[in-house]
Amino acid sequence: MNPVIKQFKFGQSTVTLETGRIARQASGAVLVTVDNDVTVLVTVVGAKTADPSKGFFPLSVHYQEKTYAAGKIPGGFFKREGRPSEKETLTSRLIDRPIRPLFPEGFMNEVQVVCTVVSTSKKTDPDIASMIGTSAALAVSGIPFNGPIGAARVAFHPDTGYLLNPNYEQLKASSLDMVVAGTETAVLMVESEADELTEDQMLGAVLFAHQEFQAVIQAVKEFAAEAGKPTWNWQAPAANTPLLDAIRSQFGEAISQAYTITIKQDRYNRLDELREQVIAALAGEGEGKFAADEVKAAFGEIEYRTVRQNIVDGKPRIDGRDTRTVRPLKIEVGVLDKTHGSALFTRGETQALVVATLGTARDAQLLDTLEGEKKDPFMLHYNFPPFSVGECGRMGGAGRREIGHGRLARRGVAAMLPKDDEFPYTIRVVSEITESNGSSSMASVCGASLALMDAGVPMKAPVAGIAMGLVLEGEKFAVLTDILGDEDHLGDMDFKVAGTAKGVTALQMDIKIQGITEEIMEQALEQALEARLNILGQMNQVISQSRTELSANAPTMLAMKIDQDKIRDVIGKGGATIRAICEETKASIDIEDDGSIKIFGETKDAAEAAKQRVLAITAEAEIGKIYVGKVERIVDFGAFVNILPGKDGLVHISMLSDQRVEKVTDVLKEGQEVKVLVLDVDNRGRIKLSIKDVAAAEASGV
């Protein structure tokens, strides 16, 4: 095919879509360029046949940043890109979330999306370009897809309002970093962090983005009309109505009763029993029998319909609650003796053990990004072991889900952390999910806030998080507060809000269906605020503000500043001086180019000892001040006395005594300690001392 190029305006930016020149063997391939700042190659490949052994839709999204895009060579021994970075993993999830619900129900063919950043000026994040490219590549591929989607990033400033697709510099001054994606009629995904914005401001940002990215959707439609391949001839499998009717008539009441069992494991055990009974009754090869896999799938469909219908009919939820009630909370802090800060946060059958650890500036995470090397002094790691849901499973490194949940929890608390110059510690928070039945990422937000306050980190305000759900059936809908795992799985929306009593700090939304209105989002935010204030109230009864002192187990940090021309004196030749201080005091010292010094010691005494050594090296002789010094060298005309490290002054023979002195050695010996008064320091730094004037100076109170 001949190359097709489409150019359009998106806010202040010019976006170019191109297909037919690169990666022509993929089902769909689009090269997207935004303002000549960033170029991303997006390819989509769909398998022509489905794998019947897979009981799920095998969609995979891979976002990758090539270092050559920024004119760099990778570090490390092999000098090539390795496993995905955390940024790449998070962006892959960001692209996956809005496109997954748009593939038709029952479509099980494998689809792989690969987004490769091939050129960047390092001024803007390539994620929005990647999402636009994914939308366009799917639109031209012919793969069944109910798109296209649009995507936008939104910033907010109280004085200037909303800003579309800000660059990195503009984001630094913003109170909001939000990414929104959706179709022409619906918002499907929101990912954001904010500095205590109101619910109205957050909703306004979502609606602003949805309005602005209509330009993307229209452009992709026109692009697909010109360059698109024929849509696959794929038909959704017909519903097995006789099988569904058979399960409903024989087991419908029993399934409905099972969903009134409030304890998760007991409920699952009962549903497993019923599933086996249904398979035994209806699976087989004879007349009126069905394949076992079909029966299992139909049983799941009946479960899905039963729970949803009960909720919209106003019946109690699975665990007996109404739609607005938060599960019972149990909150403990200081649960681990030797850690710097810890909390155990339990909400119903979801539990997080969260630990905060303080370290030195050297413990900050070094990030090698396309924009260059950065240091991150705050880490939040989320672990989800299989025992938390009563299962055996793989143990190992963090998966995509754990990385995504950890980042969401981090967003929730990051805005409330003190600035680096106020609290120059590196902070690592680890959330161990010890029990899970829904909303473990929001339990991590609550636990992180508690553990940080327990550690003595001066938080601006406590933070809590809550997960909301939605069931929409026809004209009826129900917004659910504090959803269970089953409600998340069977519902139409996952809506997570973290914030303080004053405002929202993080909002994540994933919507599985079309038709979520502004009214529904408003109600979800209103219910989330009510629940958040309830949780914060209970948290504040346990610990309402940060402890005034750090844990005795935490390192002590002392900050000071010296003249820039003294830095080399502290470091010494080849680093000998600073190395000696660190070895002798068992403290670590970080010196910045502006003369700022941070001293970290495992104990307060160690840090103080190191500080005194630095002060001694950098101190200047003060005129009129008395020092106790040591005679270093005697000459005919006087004696050189060391009063500060590296600083000797001259006591002229005439200044040794009120009496006439014939020989200096009659009065002083080398190594002798004496009191001296600083008389003068000339412009070359030479220090003039006196011994005979000390008594008079002491008498006058110097």
Curated annotation (Swiss-Prot):
It catalyses: RNA(n+1) + phosphate = RNA(n) + a ribonucleoside 5'-diphosphate. Residues 624-692 form the S1 motif domain. InterPro entries: ExoRNase_PH_dom1, ExoRNase_PH_dom2, ExoRNase_PH_dom2_sf, KH_dom, KH_dom_type_1, KH_dom_type_1_sf, NA-bd_OB-fold, PNPase. Keywords: Cytoplasm, Magnesium, Metal-binding, Nucleotidyltransferase, RNA-binding, Transferase. Residues 555-614 form the KH domain. Its cofactor is Mg(2+). Mg(2+) binds at D488, D494. Its main location: cytoplasm. PROSITE patterns: KH_TYPE_1, S1. GO terms for cellular component: cytosol. One of its GO terms (biological process) is RNA processing. Involved in mRNA degradation. Catalyzes the phosphorolysis of single-stranded polyribonucleotides processively in the 3'- to 5'-direction. Belongs to the polyribonucleotide nucleotidyltransferase family. Component of the RNA degradosome, which is a multiprotein complex involved in RNA processing and mRNA degradation. This is Polyribonucleotide nucleotidyltransferase. The lineage of its organism: Bacteria, Pseudomonadati, Pseudomonadota, Gammaproteobacteria, Pseudomonadales.
